[in-house]
Design a protein with these regions (language model features):
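Carbohydrate-active catalytic/glycan-binding domains of CAZyme proteins
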Residues: 1-284
């Protein structure tokens, strides 16, 4: 996300001794990993471990809201979507004591990302982590019967975290679409009247992990899958299991992650330039 200081900030899953990692860039190409803990305190509902997939938006009042996946104390290892607020993009972020979504009976809620619509309304997209209660195999959902892993859309108040009404489903995995055991990591942008929903299919440990997109003319859908592998393994010099994309609100830049090398021990962050035209997205 681009902050009020004109710099770009990226936020990453726990690692390097931090719950939430933060990197900064002046130009979106060269990044510096900061030695800070963006989420130094926790809410009462979450454990100390496994903080995943943070996303940050800037509110109209200049404050920053972080969405993240935290492990539920009441039903570990399943996760809830937590929210936290800070005065600066680097934090410290202070968590709210009530999670935005849990749905623990369906496997939990993860991979939240914020979105500001053209009329000023705020939304959050996230994944119901159904594969966490699957029956084994690839990402615990490769053995029949396969479990649903829907992407939901939640409208929120201007504060970025108070729900308005119920969440609605806008996408789900479909074996006939080649999605594998799941769809996950939603990222929503609007371009020239078309909503682009970026997401990943398959498991991040699978060479088939990728970035795809679906489009709609209404924020609530229906979303039509392009079934285009926008980024896939082997692309651009040999990417390995790339996915988990975040597209900036301007719609022309994208971050995603993939294995750093063939040892498959660490994930690295990658950047790409993006072009949106009509209902088509392409890497440029």
């Amino acid at each position: 996300m681009k902050a009020a200081d004109g710099k770009w900030y990226a936020f990453g899953t726990n690692g390097n001794g931090k719950r939430v990692q933060v990197a900064v860039s002046d130009d979106f190409n060269k990044w510096t990993l900061l030695d800070i803990e963006a989420l130094p305190t926790l809410a009462g509902w979450e454990t100390e471990k496994d903080h995943w997939a943070p996303d940050v938006v800037m509110r109209a009042d200049g404050k920053y809201v972080m969405y993240y996946s935290g492990e539920s104390k009441s039903d570990a290892p399943h996760h809830c979507v937590g929210t936290a607020v800070a005065d600066k993009p680097t934090g410290p972020y202070v968590p709210n004591q009530t999670p935005l979504s849990c749905r623990l009976d369906q496997g939990g809620s993860i991979d939240a990302a914020g979105f500001l619509d053209k009329d000023g309304s705020r939304y959050v997209v996230f994944k119901v982590d159904g594969n966490s209660v699957g029956h084994g195999g690839d990402c615990n959902n490769g053995v029949a019967p396969l479990v649903s892993t829907p992407i939901l859309l939640q409208k929120v108040q201007a504060d970025g975290f108070t729900p308005i009404g119920d969440a609605v489903q806008i996408l789900d995995r479909n074996t006939n679409d080649g999605d594998g055991p799941l769809v996950e990591a939603p990222s929503l942008v609007l371009h020239d009247g078309t909503y682009f929903l970026f997401y990943s299919t398959h498991c991040f440990t699978d060479p088939k992990y990728d970035v795809r997109y679906a489009t709609a003319t209404s924020i609530t859908g229906p979303y039509h899958k392009s079934n285009v592998e926008l980024v896939k393994g082997g692309d651009y010099g040999g990417l390995i299991s790339p996915g988990g994309a975040t597209v900036c609100g301007c719609g022309d830049r994208m971050l995603f992650h993939g294995w750093c090398d063939s040892s498959l021990k660490q994930r690295c962050m990658y950047v790409a330039d993006l072009r949106l035209s009509g209902t088509t997205a392409s890497i440029v």
